[in-house]
């Protein structure tokens, strides 16, 4: 029997389905990614403008070059020390050991990995700079009824406090800004 995916989590419109010409329904926003450029505070690096990323050793999440916009893409296009990787588990140690100047990650993912790697109370060792506006996340489905069911459930847990408990459980403290 052919397996079919009912739901995917995505932050880009129809990014998995646009070539198939299939109607895709997007849910309400589940949470926002807070993409930040993060460096060691003690290094006092300057990277307030996009062109500042052209000469730094940068480790970013996979597809950052596309997600972070054309100005960022231009800045890192000729940077031989720019890397994108799916595995964000290594980035905390790479940054802490000064093997990279900057990592680009959702702040909440970084903080979670930081606590797992280096223990609690280390977030103050780093500087967090906003690189783009928050990125809304939602689910995508080919089934309108499934989307509506999901939205009703999401609304309910947001209203009854369960949503906030989930954020705290999995992200310790969900931080909505860099």
Regions found by a protein language model. Give the residues of each.
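Acidic, polar ligand-binding/catalytic clefts
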Residues: 1-53, 62-68, 127-131
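A ligand-binding cleft/hinge motif common to bilobed small-molecule-binding domains
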Residues: 10-21, 71, 101-131
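Solvent-exposed, acidic/flexible segments
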Residues: 30, 84-88, 103, 107, ...
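Short helices/loops that flank or line small-molecule/ion binding pockets
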Residues: 1-6, 88-109, 116-117
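Ligand-binding cleft/hinge of the Venus flytrap
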Residues: 26-29, 52-56, 61-86, 112-122, ...
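Extended ligand-binding regions for polar small-molecule ligands
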Residues: 41-63, 136-174
